[in-house]
């Protein structure tokens, strides 16, 4: 009986902790992980950072950076790219794996890649014609959302 109550209380506590979300807090460029700073300097050398925040989520802390051009980039705690949204602009070459770029150019020659997200098992690509593609880790299209 005591063990059952303990498990119920533990489940409630863990559930509450997972739902409790710390607010994003502003950070300076120097507080971003080195890999994130390098990514921004290489891919957006002439774009200034409007603001950067850190989400201190207990499970997966991450950083979000918004550039003056409106580009939003999300990094994991180590500075690895998680997501990029370009708000109607083409994402610079070199950010997206060449296999995805070539596939998009082959099937959608007149559109730009405007969004890219790296998941644990998939990639998601947003195109300027509002089509969204989901690919597996072998770059096979597994879902098309239009």
Language model segments and positions:
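Repetitive helical segments and hydrophobic/amphipathic motifs
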Residues: 13-14
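Long, terminal "pre-/pro-" and other extracytoplasmic accessory regions
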Residues: 2, 6-8, 18-146
């Amino acid at each position: 009986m005591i063990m059952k109550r303990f498990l119920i209380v533990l489940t409630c506590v863990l559930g509450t902790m997972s739902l409790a979300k710390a607010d994003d807090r502003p950070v300076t460029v120097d507080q971003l992980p080195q890999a994130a700073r390098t990514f921004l300097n290489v891919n957006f050398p002439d774009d200034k950072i409007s603001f950067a925040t850190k989400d201190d989520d207990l499970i997966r802390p991450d950083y979000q950076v918004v550039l003056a051009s409106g580009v939003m980039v999300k990094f994991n705690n180590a500075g690895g790219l998680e997501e990029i949204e370009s708000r109607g602009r083409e994402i610079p070459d070199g950010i997206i794996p060449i296999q995805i770029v070539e596939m998009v150019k082959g099937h959608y020659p007149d559109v730009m890649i405007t969004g890219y997200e790296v998941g644990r098992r998939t990639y998601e690509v947003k195109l300027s014609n509002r089509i969204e593609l989901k690919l597996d880790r072998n770059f096979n299209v597994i879902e098309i959302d239009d």
